[in-house]
């Protein structure tokens, strides 16, 4: 009988997942992203609480001179994960990796996985998103492994969720978006001059884009809330997961204060965003993660083509 191991990149926030996931997350291994800040190197999720990290970022006087950055895991780190679980008797491995639009990590892990094709069936999934929604894909995959599901069925469920989940966030300040090159030229200048706050969103191709903008954070929060309500539509509360997510908490109280007006009711604990995400967008972003739960009447997509491409299997 096959043994399937689930792995997730550290950006999936499993290290700081809510208590309800305490037992199941222990079954999932983590490939860690490197972080460089104030002359020191860290592995994400090891020895650095994200809340403390964001407090430090908020108080940095010279942001440009102290700009943190990230680095991919090394070949040795990724190979060690594969070798360890293959040696432990696992013949199938699913890796959930942060969106390929956010850097080369997904592709790098996929290339390392190719070196082990003769030893195990390894599939590296592009989550097309990051933070805890990425981690939730890994948690769902682990739940399915525990129920005895095989890799193709797990990937079908993952692809359905990827196609339906949504994230949107309001960034109170543009400093990190500008310095990291995500906001450039005239848009950057006018944005700072006019106190424009972008409402950012992961499209279903996995790209972090500006969905729309507003003058001032309150107007941006209102636009974000209205968009969220539109996405949810008439879907019943038991058919989705909804929670707040943030880097720093500067806007969380204002976010909560608007919720009654828009009849927004979260049904899951808040989850802090990964430090790697904060490095790119800054410590002043708040948002919502909306995760539909597939109903029996909602059809699964076919087994994704990347399953056959990465494993060498032939589609039936």
Give names to the regions the model predicted:
Residues 40-95, 100, 107, 114-115:
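Class I S-adenosyl-L-methionine
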Residues 3-5, 10-40, 83, 92, ...:
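Mixed-charge interfacial surface used for oligomerization/domain docking
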């Amino acid at each position: 009988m096959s043994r399937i191991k689930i792995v997730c990149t550290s950006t999936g926030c499993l290290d700081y997942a809510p208590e309800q996931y305490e037992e199941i997350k222990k079954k999932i291994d983590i490939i860690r992203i490197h972080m460089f800040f104030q002359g020191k190197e860290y592995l994400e999720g090891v020895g650095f609480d994200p809340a403390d990290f964001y407090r430090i970022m908020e108080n940095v006087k010279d942001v440009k001179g102290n700009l943190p950055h990230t680095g991919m895991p090394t070949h040795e780190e990724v190979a060690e994960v594969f070798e360890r679980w293959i040696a432990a008797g696992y013949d199938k491995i699913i890796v959930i990796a942060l969106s390929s639009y956010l850097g080369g990590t997904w592709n790098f892990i996929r290339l390392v996985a190719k070196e082990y094709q003769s030893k195990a069936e390894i599939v590296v999934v592009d989550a097309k998103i990051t933070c805890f929604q990425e981690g939730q894909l890994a948690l769902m995959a682990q739940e399915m492994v525990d129920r005895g599901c095989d890799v193709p069925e797990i990937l079908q469920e993952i692809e359905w969720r990827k196609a339906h989940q949504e994230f949107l966030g309001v960034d109170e300040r543009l400093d990190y978006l500008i310095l990291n090159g995500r906001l450039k030229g005239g848009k950057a200048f006018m944005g700072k001059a006019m106190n424009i706050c972008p409402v950012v969103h992961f499209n279903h191709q996995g790209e972090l884009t500006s969905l729309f903008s507003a003058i001032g954070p309150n107007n941006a929060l209102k636009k974000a809330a209205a968009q969220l309500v539109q996405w949810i539509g008439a879907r019943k509360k038991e058919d989705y997961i909804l929670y707040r997510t943030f880097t720093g908490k500067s806007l969380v109280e204002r976010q909560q204060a608007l919720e009654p007006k828009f009849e927004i009711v979260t049904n899951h604990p808040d989850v802090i965003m990964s430090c790697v995400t904060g490095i790119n967008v800054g410590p002043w972003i708040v948002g919502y993660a909306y995760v539909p739960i597939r109903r029996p009447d909602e059809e699964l997509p076919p087994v994704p083509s990347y399953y056959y491409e990465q494993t060498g299997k032939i589609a039936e």
